[in-house]
From Swiss-Prot:
GO biological process, one term: flavonoid biosynthetic process
Species of provenance: Fragaria ananassa
Enzyme class: transferase
UniProt-listed Enzyme Commission number(s): 2.3.1.74
Tissue localization of expression: Predominantly in developing fruit.
Lineage: Eukaryota, Viridiplantae, Streptophyta, Embryophyta, Tracheophyta
Pfam family, one: Chal_sti_synt_C
Function: The primary product of this enzyme is 4,2',4',6'-tetrahydroxychalcone (also termed naringenin-chalcone or chalcone) which can under specific conditions spontaneously isomerize into naringenin.
Pathway of action: Secondary metabolite biosynthesis; flavonoid biosynthesis
Protein name: Chalcone synthase RJ5
Length: 99
């Protein structure tokens, strides 16, 4: 059981700022957990499903630049989720590799 959602790295599809705000609030996520998502949203907008690949690459690059031991911000496990029409959600559990 996960008791602290901050113990994971997050690759979240940026459906929009309001959705990200709600995810952050409901899961009690620290703002930095969705930092890569918000950065990609501000730089490129909502690119549909391709967004998660851009966010995954952003997290990977930042992890390496910051000297983290894994590609997932130094964490072993993460979550990737995307939003679809009618507010459907697809979720994948990720296992990070060494940087």
């Amino acid at each position: 059981n996960i008791t602290d959602w901050n113990s994971l790295f997050w690759i979240a599809h940026p459906g929009g700022p309001a959705i990200l705000d709600q995810v952050e609030a409901k899961l009690a996520l620290k703002p930095e957990k969705l930092e890569a998502t918000r950065h990609i949203l501000s730089e490129y907008g909502n690119m549909s499903s391709a967004c998660v690949l851009f966010i995954l690459d952003e997290v990977r690059r930042k992890s390496a630049a910051n000297g983290h031991k894994t590609t997932g911000e130094g964490l072993e496990w993460g979550v990737l989720f995307g939003f679809g029409p009618g507010l459907t959600v697809e979720t994948v559990v990720l296992h990070s590799v060494s940087a």
